[in-house]
């Protein structure tokens, strides 16, 4: 029987963490995180990282392994996770991958295009330009250099825009030319399970989760990482709103409201992305019995 990767997918706040723990305990296996922010050791509360108690229940990988200043790409994540899976499959025939970072999930399930590594000189040049000229200027430049990618990239995400320009400048080719979208075959079976809730139910959970984060000390966590606010790792819902409060631009009540609003918006983006994937079979998180039956029906 081939090794199996159970991929547990869903929007922020849907209930992936608790269900992934239950499934992992059932199979006596480990969990690999596919959350690009839970990688950072200093971002525990705002990323809803697994608690010490949850980490004690099931071994987790790719949680709290990076410093805020570390540069880490989806391509590096792909390489590191595939290497870790090879080790885990020596003792387990099933491993859980769970998270809401769409690009990280695709990196493991489908593979990342072989895009050249950006040299440090080009990276520093583009970061300086971003700081001095702003995102709008770089977006306009991307429109000229790679109009095809300009049409599909999230123009509000500086990391994506900057990276595309880095490739354009370093290679003299468009970023689009490297995006072959070739699906890489994996040496393990992939079972994709999506978790979903009614919108009103999900939004209520998101709102309550933000309130719990505030009670758990999100403001203090944001204050501790405030000196690093310019880093891409902190261009994240929960932290960027707290920074506005710490700057004196927003009241605390308004900042909390914006965290809730932006989290809801992000959940919609996640669902739009996930709905494109026809391999995902969808369940409500309370359907644990049906989920386990489905896994066993396809994993034999």
UniProtKB/Swiss-Prot annotation:
Pfam families: IPPT (PF01715). GO terms for molecular function: ATP binding; tRNA dimethylallyltransferase activity. This is tRNA dimethylallyltransferase 1. Residues 35-38 are annotated as: Interaction with substrate tRNA. It comes from Phocaeicola vulgatus (strain ATCC 8482 / DSM 1447 / JCM 5826 / CCUG 4940 / NBRC 14291 / NCTC 11154) (Bacteroides vulgatus). Belongs to the IPP transferase family. GO terms for biological process: tRNA modification. Keywords: ATP-binding, Magnesium, Nucleotide-binding, Transferase, tRNA processing. Monomer. ATP binds at residues 10-17. The keyword Protein biosynthesis does not apply. It catalyses: adenosine(37) in tRNA + dimethylallyl diphosphate = N(6)-dimethylallyladenosine(37) in tRNA + diphosphate. Substrate binds at residues 12-17. InterPro entries: Dimethylallyltransferase (IPR039657), IPT (IPR018022), P-loop_NTPase (IPR027417). Its cofactor is Mg(2+). Catalyzes the transfer of a dimethylallyl group onto the adenine at position 37 in tRNAs that read codons beginning with uridine, leading to the formation of N6-(dimethylallyl)adenosine (i(6)A).
């Amino acid at each position: 029987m081939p090794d199996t990767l159970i991929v547990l997918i869903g929007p922020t706040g849907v209930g992936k963490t608790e269900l992934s723990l239950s499934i992992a305990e059932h199979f006596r296996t480990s969990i690999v995180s596919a959350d690009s922010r839970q990688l950072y050791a200093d971002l525990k509360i705002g990323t809803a990282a697994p608690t010490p108690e949850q980490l004690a229940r099931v071994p987790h990988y790719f949680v709290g392994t990076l410093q805020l200043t570390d540069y880490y790409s989806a391509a590096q994540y792909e390489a590191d996770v595939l290497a870790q899976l090879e080790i885990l499959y020596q003792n387990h025939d099933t491993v859980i991958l769970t998270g809401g970072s769409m690009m990280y999930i695709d990196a493991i399930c489908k593979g990342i295009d072989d895009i050249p590594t950006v040299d440090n000189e080009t990276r520093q040049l583009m970061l300086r330009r971003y700081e001095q000229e702003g995102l709008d200027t770089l977006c306009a430049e991307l429109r000229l250099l790679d109009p095809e990618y300009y049409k599909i990239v999230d123009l509000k995400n500086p990391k994506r825009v900057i990276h595309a320009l880095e490739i354009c400048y370093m290679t003299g080719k468009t970023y689009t030319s490297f995006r072959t979208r070739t699906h890489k075959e994996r040496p393990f079976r992939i079972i994709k399970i999506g978790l979903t809730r009614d919108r009103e139910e999900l939004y209520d959970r998101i709102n309550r989760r933000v309130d719990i984060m505030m009670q758990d000390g999100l403001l203090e966590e944001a204050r501790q990482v405030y000196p690093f606010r310019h880093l891409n790792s902190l261009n994240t819902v929960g932290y960027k709103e707290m920074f506005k409060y710490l700057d004196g631009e927003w009241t605390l009540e308004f900042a909390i409201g914006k965290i809730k609003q932006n989290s809801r918006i992000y959940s919609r983006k996640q669902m739009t992305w996930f709905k494109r994937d026809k391999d995902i079979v969808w369940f409500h998180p309370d359907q644990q019995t049906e989920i386990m039956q489905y896994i066993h029906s396809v994993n034999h």
